Amino acid sequence: GIHAGGLRYHGMAPLVSHCKELGLIEAQAYHQTACFEAGVTFARAEGIVPALESNHAVKAAIEEALRCKREGKADTILFNLSGHGHFDMMAYTDYFAGKLQDLNYDEADLAQALAGLPAVPA
């Protein structure tokens, strides 16, 4: 299945959007199972089970660390661990049982859905 984890807010915060527009941050997208894997890696290394919404940031931080390792750099990597995953144990159980799946949405279906949205002034 699909796990809609975290804070149930799947939009973009205005401040985060503005920081991206200014080029201060980059947006990254990862499949849910890769994020769960990153959360498990973090838990095993740090002893903290991350909240599911934090796993996306953990995944990005791990990817940045691997990039630094490949490039021989010692960059500082900052990410937000928004909370613990103690209330998310059933989702972790589903992950370990192989019940979660990654889905790829068809670009044509996405374009059709977006075309049906009303125009909103900026």
Task: Pin down the residues of each PLM region.
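Claisen-condensing/thiolase-fold acyl-transfer catalytic domains that form or cleave C-C bonds
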Residues: Q32-F96
